[in-house]
Amino acid sequence: MRNYELTTITRVSSREVAKSEIQETLKKHSVSVTAEEDWGQRKLWHPIKHEEQGIFHHYKCSADPNAIEKVEKEFLINQNILRSMVVRLHG
């Protein structure tokens, strides 16, 4: 198990749906979330998929590297997630 930070930007129009989809995906791949922060709605620097604003969510979690790869692939397919970034924490 490794520790990761995961940040997502979701569509404003699907705020609750996107958040539940993220949580379901993490649970499905046995990702253990240790901390969760809702950074709120923010204006994007440039439009992403024709969206001017997005909802930012930040998670600290631990998981198997293979599980994180699967989560990232599912996030790419999900239409409610505009962007996501996973960073491995060392230490």
From Swiss-Prot:
One GO biological process term: translation
Record flagged with keyword Ribosomal protein: yes
GO cellular component terms given for this protein: ribonucleoprotein complex; ribosome
MF GO annotations: small ribosomal subunit rRNA binding; structural constituent of ribosome
Database matches in InterPro entries: Ribosomal_bS6, Ribosomal_bS6_sf, Ribosomal_S6_plastid/chlpt, Transl_elong_EF1B/ribsomal_bS6
Alphabetical UniProt keywords: Ribonucleoprotein, Ribosomal protein, RNA-binding, rRNA-binding
Cytoplasm among keywords: no
Entry similarity comment: Belongs to the bacterial ribosomal protein bS6 family.
Its job: Binds together with bS18 to 16S ribosomal RNA.
Protein name: Small ribosomal subunit protein bS6
Organism in which the protein naturally occurs: Leptospira interrogans serogroup Icterohaemorrhagiae serovar Lai (strain 56601)
Gene field: rpsF
